[in-house]
C-alpha cells in the first residue's frame, strides 16, 4: 500500500535555550530532524511532508531535498493542527506521523507498525515505562482493546497509574484522516488540538487500534533540553559501538568512541579510546587506530595504522601504510602501500608513493612523491606565491635532505638528492645532487657579546 509520511518539526524548544530550532540540534553530527528524514526515506514513501514553524527558513535551508515538501504551521496549536496543515498533500493509502525530535527511531520498528494498518485499522506505537510521567496514557477496555489516549495533564489518578504511554507515532488509513482531523476540538487543559483524540474517534467509528512497541524504549525518546540531547547522543554512540563490535571491531572502550556519519569496517579492526569518525569512512581488515584520532571522509586500506593524536580528512592510506603520532592528512592526501608519515607531518593534496617516508616535521602540499623516496625532517614544499598554488613532483628513490625548502613549481627526477638545508628553486635531473645553501665560514678567535 502507498505511504505518505508527515514529520512534525514546528516546535521552538524553549528549554534548549538556543537560537537554533530544536530539531536542528545535532545527534552524532547530524540534526535530529535529519536522522528522522533518513529513517523516513528508508521506508520508500510516496511523499515526505515536513511541518515547520519556528525557524522555518533555517530548517528549510538546512534540510532541503527534492523528495521533501515543507509545510508551514504559522501558529503552534497542537499536533492535530500541525498534521492538518499537510492534509492537502496527502493522498496515499496510509499516513505515518513522525516527530522531528525523536531521532533514534528505527526503520524496522516502523515497518512492523505499518504492517498493522489497514482501511479499518489504525496502528499506534506505544512504550511501557516504569515512570511514564509526561506521556499520554493508553486506555484499554476489559478485552485489552485500545479505547483512547488521555494526555498526562488531563488524566485522572487511576489513568496516571497506567504504565503504557503514547509515543505519538501513529499510522492511519489515508482515507479517514481528513475526516477525523476536521472533528478535533481544543477543549482540554492545553487548549490545543490533540492528534491523540483521533484514537477515540476511530474507535467510535468502529475501527480497531493495533499497537506495536519498539525493541528499545530509547528509540522513542525525544529531546526537550540539552540534558536529554546528551542522553540521546550517548545512547546513539553505544548503539553504534555495539554494531561495530558485532562486525569484528575491537573497541578499547565503547563508551569513549564517537561515530558522526557512516563507517564501513572489515574484520580484526582495533580502535583505541577517544576516536571520532566523521562523514564517510572506510576501514578495511586489520587496521589499527590509536587514541585521540579524528578521521573524516577517509579510507584506510588493509593493515593501515593510524597512531595517536592524528587527524585525517579526505585521505586515503594504502595497505600497510602508517601515520602519526600527531600527523595531519588534509583533503587529497594519498599514502601508497607501506608509506610512512611520522609525527608533526602535514600533507595536503599530496601523494606519497609505495614505501616512501616522511618521518617528521614536514609540510607536503600540492606534491607528488615517488615510491621509496625519503623526505628529511623539516622539509617544506613552498607551494604558494601569495596568489596561486604550484606543484612539486618527485620521481622514485628521491632523497630530500633535512631542512630543505622546495620552491614550486619544481620537478626532481628519479634518484635525485638535495643536501640538508638547501633551498631548491630549479628542477633537479635524475641521479643528481642539488645544493642550494650558503657556504659555511668559520671565524677564529670570535667572542660572544657580553651584557653591558
Swiss-Prot record:
GO terms for biological process: cell morphogenesis; cell wall organization; lipid A biosynthetic process; peptidoglycan biosynthetic process; regulation of cell shape; UDP-N-acetylglucosamine biosynthetic process. Mg(2+) binds at residues 101, 224. Its EC number is 2.7.7.23, 2.3.1.157. Disulfide bonds: none annotated. Residues 227-247 are annotated as: Linker. UDP-N-acetyl-alpha-D-glucosamine binds at residues 8-11, 22, 73, 78-79, 99-101, 136, 151, 166, 224, 330, 348, 363, 374. The keyword Transferase applies. In the N-terminal section; belongs to the N-acetylglucosamine-1-phosphate uridyltransferase family. In the C-terminal section; belongs to the transferase hexapeptide repeat family. Homotrimer. Catalyzes the last two sequential reactions in the de novo biosynthetic pathway for UDP-N-acetylglucosamine (UDP-GlcNAc). The C-terminal domain catalyzes the transfer of acetyl group from acetyl coenzyme A to glucosamine-1-phosphate (GlcN-1-P) to produce N-acetylglucosamine-1-phosphate (GlcNAc-1-P), which is converted into UDP-GlcNAc by the transfer of uridine 5-monophosphate (from uridine 5-triphosphate), a reaction catalyzed by the N-terminal domain. This is Bifunctional protein GlmU. It comes from Stutzerimonas stutzeri (strain A1501). The lineage of its organism: Bacteria, Pseudomonadati, Pseudomonadota, Gammaproteobacteria, Pseudomonadales. The gene is glmU.
